[in-house]
Regions:
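Divalent-cation
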Residues: 1-165
Length: 165
């Protein structure tokens, strides 16, 4: 299975759905666009940007449970695309495989520094040319999310325009 990396988290310009872009790291560099929920998009963007909350969210909690059990996430495998839904599994260091939503699996991979691979068959069907993907970014790993959070921390009502009356 070819390895991919999270290229960006954002909003699909055509559908306004939150998406994660998985980019093939070798070969044609195809992009797999995975629709995700708002919470998973924010968690993925924060992980991509290296932003940590004061208290652990669900994904950090799962990582802590794995560590406490003496296990390590080795890789995330996106193995199937069925009825427009991507299916993934978490591969642990002891050979255990755990069924997972792809959105949760990607966030865990980002937080726990695990590889992400996508089945050739999935890439063949869902992989698109990078030049055809238009996404408004939430996070690209370039510090955008952290800069936005800093702005929100210091923003006052005067920083915003009055709403039209």
């Amino acid at each position: 299975m070819p390895q991919v990396r999270v290229k960006a988290v954002g909003t699909d310009a055509a559908t306004t759905s939150r998406v994660v872009l998985l980019e093939e790291t070798s070969g044609a560099g195809r992009i797999v666009v995975v629709a995700v929920g708002e919470a998973e998009a924010l968690a993925a963007a924060a992980a991509l940007e290296g932003v940590q909350s004061a208290r652990p969210g669900t994904h950090r909690l799962i990582g802590a449970v794995l560590r406490a059990a003496g296990r390590r996430l080795v890789r995330v495998r996106v193995h199937t695309l069925r009825d427009a839904v991507f299916h993934a599994e978490l591969d642990l260091d002891d050979g255990t495989r755990i069924d997972s939503r792809t959105s949760d699996a990607v966030v865990l991979a980002l937080l726990l520094d695990a590889d992400i691979v996508v089945a050739d068959a999935v890439l063949t069907v869902a992989g698109v040319d990078p030049s055809t993907v238009v996404v408004e970014g939430l996070g690209t790993g370039s510090g955008e999310l952290e800069a936005f959070r800093r702005f929100l921390d210091t923003a006052t009502p005067d920083d915003f325009d009055e709403p039209p009356r």
